[in-house]
Amino acid sequence: MLAQPRVKRLLSSEHFSVDGTLIEAWASMKSFKAKDGKGGDDEGSGGRNASADFRGEKRSNETHASTTDPDAMLYRKGPGMEAKLCFIGHGLMENRSGLIVDTRMTRVSGHAERLAALDMIEAWADRPRAITLGADRGYDAADFVEELRTLNVRPHVARNTSRRRSAIDGRTTRHPGYAASQRIRKRIEEAFGWIKTVAGMRKTKLRGLDKVDWAFAFTAAAYNLVRLPKLLGEEAPA
């Protein structure tokens, strides 16, 4: 669809945004059982998103897995919030049109969003001229920023200065396009909102990473189709 001549004219090849969104798995917490087949109090380890306490039993992705969908992993968005079995859907948006030009679905991990972003942007970065990638502060990590620069991608990433030093310095924030990238990148939330509400992907009805990945890509394409009539109508006559 994006390769069609009229659609291709809507796209720039220089400015993009990336983000991720949680997709709840089609599996209940009752299916999240010890991998060794035993019950009991497992200590669990990892960050705040890796473990949760269920009626005195400690469960984590290291010690437990869903018997309904082994690809789904336990995730808690923040302290005091309910832990759920989830995947992470990732989208790459072209900034001028707001169309989604690539997607990924991955298991939950602390590095999943940044790895998916690198995977998606690499195909667009294979050119002499630098391109830009806008992202929220969750992507502000030194290794990710350095990898983008190696690919000749300008990291228009929001600065995260809470309890640490940001990897984004003045040479980036002073760039004329940085503020524009930070403003436009938020439009990807419109796509995620449509995918999760209108297309029903807030909680998938499929099991297995490959199937959920396919469904996410399909609904992103549907979002683009909904957007296209307006975009094509705004296109200046040839």
What are these regions (language model features)?
Residues 1-147, 223:
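Polybasic low-complexity intrinsically disordered regions
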Residues 198, 202, 229-238:
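A short, flexible helix-boundary coil/loop motif
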Residues 218, 222-225, 231:
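Aspartic protease catalytic domain
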Residues 39-41, 46, 137-210, 214-217:
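Helix-centered, glycine/charged polyanion-binding patches within enzymatic domains
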